[in-house]
Design a protein with these regions (language model features):
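ALDH superfamily catalytic-core signature
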Residues: 209-351, 414, 461-464
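N-terminal Rossmann-like NAD(P)+-binding subdomain of aldehyde/semialdehyde dehydrogenases
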Residues: 1-112
Length: 466
């Protein structure tokens, strides 16, 4: 059984039945049959479904936000923002459908016509996490449904309400039954799904361990995978012209979603000239933050996704401090109340070779590093096995862009956060995974770019091509 373990209260709520292995064949057969029909629909019909889905997300924003507030503790204002982004994604792919799926005509080269057409490849498996329950699904589902692929979606076990809502909205929007199938399944059941010949590709957002397992099985079965596995993103400040404003931006972005965002800036890197001012300012800023329930309008952050997640982070911080791997300047303790609450924390003097220095902390923990100059700041930023996103902050845009060009990430921003938008590609390198989602790149992963070359029988291009 899956149950909502409400992180706001620590209490178990609704329960949902998990599938058993005997149901796998039926699920995949239904998805395959649906694919044969869905791929044959006109682009206009698919776009209309996505457009209606966007409308439904907006119409149900309050209900949908409440689901994820109860499931994983997301503050209501953040939850509503997530639902709106999802609506934007579905609407983007609806409005740009013809542009994104347009045939590409190539120079004829002794043929009468040479064209590359974007075609679907079949049923896809999505394995999605709990931190953005609607957004992660939309990022994968919208472009692939537009292409004509069908989807089997295994969501995080703590998000049963929101995962079912994703299917319900698409079906109400006009998507044929079984073109999107939500399943309540365990991670251990996924290997058989990935290996099954009826699944033609798999997208996972989650842990490195899960990503490695999926990539291995997908590779052994000659099918494509897309992985988004988190990050330890740097936030470089190269001058102190607007220091307090920049630090406010950092704190806002780092603590967004209670610090549970893959592309949040985990490592703040500042020059030694203004390091002490940075630490002093953030120590007070973070110490003054209010922790509350998901529906508390005055809360700065909410609970962690689960009591277990909270306990793991607190234990890591305590161990780091005890071993001399970091100094906890403020926070980092459990809050004595029912639910998965902790004090937001600020760490300094972090040894980058230790757990808290080199591994992602998925919670409300800010880390400040000191660099003697810009060159060392770049070196610290690139001293990571991750490579999701980064940002550079400075008043000299040319200098900031020069720094940005030296960072080894999938996405780099100057004077703004690692933003998510339907029209921007999303993805990383190294231990952060591979592949791209959103914008035109979203229809470029699970697609057959099919070459058609047409020649008359009297065309000299018919001779062997060797």
């Amino acid at each position: 059984m899956f149950a909502i373990e409400n992180p706001n209260t620590g209490k178990s709520e609704d329960q949902f039945e998990r599938i058993d292995d005997s149901q796998r064949d039926d699920i995949l057969d239904r998805s395959t049959v649906a694919y044969d029909a869905w791929r044959s629909t006109r682009i206009e019909e698919r776009a209309a479904v996505l457009s209606r889905a966007a409308d439904l997300y907006e119409e149900r924003i309050d209900e949908l936000a409440d689901h994820i507030g109860r499931e994983m503790g997301k503050l209501t204002r953040w939850a509503k923002a997530e639902v709106q982004i999802v609506a934007d994604i579905y609407r983007y792919y609806s409005e740009h459908a013809h542009e994104l799926l347009a045939d590409e005509y190539l120079p004829a080269q002794n043929a009468d016509k040479t064209v590359v057409r974007k075609e679907p490849i079949g049923p896809l498996l999505g394995i999605m996490p709990w931190n953005f329950p609607y957004y992660q699904v939309a990022r994968f589902a919208a472009p692939n449904l537009l292409l004509g692929n069908t989807i089997v979606l295994k969501h995080a076990s703590i998000c049963p309400l929101s995962s079912q809502a994703c299917q319900d909205i698409l079906e109400e929007a006009g998507l044929p039954k079984n073109a999107y199938i939500n399943i309540y399944a365990s991670g251990s059941q996924m290997d058989a799904f990935v290996a099954d010949k009826r699944i033609k590709g798999v997208s996972l957002t989650g842990s490195e361990a899960a990503g490695s397992a999926v990539a291995k099985t997908a590779g052994e079965n000659y099918k494509k995978s897309v992985l988004e596995l988190g990050g330890n993103d740097p936030f470089l400040v190269i001058d102190d012209e607007n220091l307090e404003w920049v630090l406010d931006q950092y704190n806002l972005i780092r603590m967004y979603n209670t610090g549970q965002a893959c592309n949040a800036p985990k490592r703040l890197i500042v020059l030694e000239d203004f390091y002490d001012r940075t630490v002093e300012y953030l120590e007070k800023k973070i110490g003054d933050m209010k922790v509350g329930t998901y529906d508390d309008e005055n809360a700065d952050i909410g609970p962690l996704s689960s009591i277990g997640a909270r306990d793991e982070i607190v234990e890591r911080l305590e161990k780091a401090a005890a071993n001399g791997d970091a100094k906890i300047r403020v926070g980092g303790k459990k809050i004595d109340r029912e639910g998965a609450y902790m004090e937001p924390a600020l760490l300094t003097d972090v040894d980058p070779s230790t757990d808290v220095g080199c591994n992602e902390i998925f919670g409300p923990v800010a880390i400040v590093y000191k660099a003697k100059d810009v060159e060392e700041a770049i070196e610290i930023a690139n001293n990571s096995e991750y490579g999701l996103s980064s940002s550079v902050w400075g008043t000299d845009l040319d200098a900031a862009f020069e720094v940005a060009n030296q960072l080894n990430d999938g996405m780099t921003f100057v004077n703004e956060a690692s933003v998510t938008a339907a029209g921007l590609p999303f993805g990383g390198v190294n231990r952060s995974g591979y592949g791209r989602e959103l914008a035109r790149w979203g229809v470029g992963e699970f697609v057959n770019e099919h070459l058609y070359r047409v020649s008359g029988q009297d065309n000299p291009g018919n001779s062997p091509a060797m």
